């Protein structure tokens, strides 16, 4: 009985993601189709979809991962920007304005996301992204045909290759769309999110500037600092992280468009590359420009590797910050307990009253994912052979995912954790006053060796540092009180 149930469950689990591939609410038996043709022949395509034969063929040939593995939406929107820009420029080179304007209108619908359901292809396809590029061409072609009152699938008066793809190749359009998508996401999502978190940490640094606590190195007691100083370190990490990300943009602004197949610009007109870059800059409001060397722009994606390297560094920073905060908030009674973190939800199904540092845990998992993505992008970026890198889809998938994860996690961490952090001043003071590392203040007065004897004696006998120092006869009570003052140990002396 159990075996039969398990078999049935496994069968259902295997098939559960197949039905969305129809992309229609109608049952398979009732769904209507139309004929579309590519160079391999005719194929039946769902009648309510704008894609054509090449997209349908890709759905059949690359049924890998299911709907969750589709090309990221920012890339599709970036393709809309590119196709609109190309149509604008191509009209100056002889493209029929009626056709060009219809392409622009259809591209606008790709840009605003209203056609996103017509882009079903997964990342796992040809490494140049040709299937997705043709998905874009077919959708824009059919939508433009519809706008002009024509018949879907007729390829007239708007042809997916001759008109939508005029003067373009997969090899230059896909890297162009990758750069546009990355830059738009960095500007519109990542930098604002990191800035919000940085500013919240900076506010906490100012709030905690008067609270003196014990420092820790090697997970052992060290000399004092203020809680504000500790948080200032986190603030500076993110300030540098934002600057690192911004520093990669100059290379991401360079666009491959105009290189066509191998970087030579075959089948384009002189000036096409620069004009398309100008049009993309106009549409997005961002300073895109044509790449100075199209051979590099097609064969290598070092700019994307560099950009994700900056994200990886940010992830390392966020991992350290989130871990520090949750360790400082450990307890509430048997941990460090120096910080009180916001209580957002119950923490345990078996331990009543338990509350966990969930925002810190979510952030550290995001960082782990980003670090993994960095490995994938590094491998992909190192594998461009001759005139073309053919790991493009996996690179942009991971880059866009990392940007989105870091951005969302930073906003969540700020709103649900950082702004609500409180200092447990009583616990902080208690821990600091028990620390033997305050003995460091005695170094200039009695020397390192004698100070070390004081610390070891206090630790061995379980006494206070002052009691040990007095029993050894190295100083008087008044001298100890004068020299061992935590508030005098948090900065350099004049």
Swiss-Prot record:
Keyword Glycosyltransferase listed: no
Keywords: Cytoplasm, DNA damage, DNA repair, Lyase, Mitochondrion, Nucleus, Transit peptide, Tricarboxylic acid cycle
GO cellular component term of the entry, any: nucleus
Compartments it resides in: Mitochondrion matrix; Cytoplasm; Nucleus
Pfam families, per the entry: FumaraseC_C, Lyase_1
Chain positions of site Important for catalytic activity: 361
Pathway in which the depicted protein is active: Carbohydrate metabolism; tricarboxylic acid cycle; (S)-malate from fumarate: step 1/1
CDD domains linked: Fumarase_classII (cd01362)
Subunit-structure text: Homotetramer.
Family matches, as NCBIfam families: fumC_II, PRK12273.1
Protein family: Belongs to the class-II fumarase/aspartase family. Fumarase subfamily.
HAMAP family: FumaraseC (MF_00743)
Protein name (Swiss-Prot/TrEMBL): Fumarate hydratase, mitochondrial
Organism per entry: Rhizopus oryzae
């Amino acid at each position: 009985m159990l075996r039969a149930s398990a078999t049935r469950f496994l069968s259902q689990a295997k098939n559960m993601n197949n039905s969305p591939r129809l992309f229609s609410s109608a049952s398979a038996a009732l769904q209507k189709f139309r004929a579309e043709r590519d160079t391999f022949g005719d194929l039946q395509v769902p009648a309510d979809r704008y894609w054509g034969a090449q997209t349908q063929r890709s759905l059949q040939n690359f049924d890998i991962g299911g709907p969750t593995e589709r090309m990221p939406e920012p890339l599709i929107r970036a393709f809309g920007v590119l196709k609109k820009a190309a149509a604008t420029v191509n009209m100056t080179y002889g493209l029929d304005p009626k056709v060009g304007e219809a392409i622009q209108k259809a591209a606008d619908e790709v840009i605003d996301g209203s056609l996103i359901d017509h882009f079903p292809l997964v990342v796992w396809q040809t490494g140049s992204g040709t299937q997705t590029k043709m998905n874009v061409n077919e959708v824009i072609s059919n939508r433009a045909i519809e706008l002009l009152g024509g018949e879907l699938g007729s390829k007239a008066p708007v042809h997916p290759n001759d008109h939508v793809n005029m003067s373009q190749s997969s090899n230059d359009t896909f890297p162009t769309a990758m750069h546009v998508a990355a830059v738009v996401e960095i500007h519109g999502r990542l930098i604002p999110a990191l800035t919000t978190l940085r500013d919240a940490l900076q506010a906490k640094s100012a709030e905690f500037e008067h609270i003196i606590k014990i420092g820790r190195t090697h997970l052992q007691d060290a000399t004092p600092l203020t809680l504000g100083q500790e948080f200032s370190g986190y603030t500076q990490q993110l300030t540098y992280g934002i600057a690192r990300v911004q520093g990669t943009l100059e290379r991401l602004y360079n666009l491959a468009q105009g290189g066509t197949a191998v970087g030579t610009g075959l089948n384009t007109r002189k000036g096409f590359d620069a004009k398309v870059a100008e049009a993309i800059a106009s549409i997005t409001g961002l300073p895109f420009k044509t790449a100075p060397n199209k051979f590099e722009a097609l064969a290598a994606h070092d700019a994307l590797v560099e950009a994700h390297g900056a994200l990886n560094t940010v992830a390392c920073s966020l991992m350290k910050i989130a871990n520090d905060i949750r360790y400082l908030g450990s307890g509430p009674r048997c941990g460090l307990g120096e910080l009180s973190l916001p209580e957002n939800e119950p923490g345990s199904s078996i331990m009543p009253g338990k509350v966990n540092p969930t925002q810190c845990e979510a952030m550290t998992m995001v960082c782990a994912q980003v670090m993994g993505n960095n490995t994938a992008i590094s491998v992909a970026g190192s594998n461009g052979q001759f005139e073309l890198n053919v790991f493009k889809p996996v690179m942009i998938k991971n880059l866009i995912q990392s940007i989105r994860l870091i951005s969302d996690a930073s906003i969540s961490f700020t709103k649900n954790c950082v702004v609500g952090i409180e200092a447990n001043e009583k616990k902080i003071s208690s821990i600091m006053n028990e620390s033997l590392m305050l003995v460091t203040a005695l170094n200039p007065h009695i020397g390192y060796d004698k100070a070390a004897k004081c610390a070891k004696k206090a630790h061995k006998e379980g006494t206070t540092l002052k009691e040990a120092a007095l029993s050894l006869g190295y100083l008087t009570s008044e001298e100890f009180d004068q020299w061992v003052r935590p508030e005098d140990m948090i900065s350099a002396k004049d």
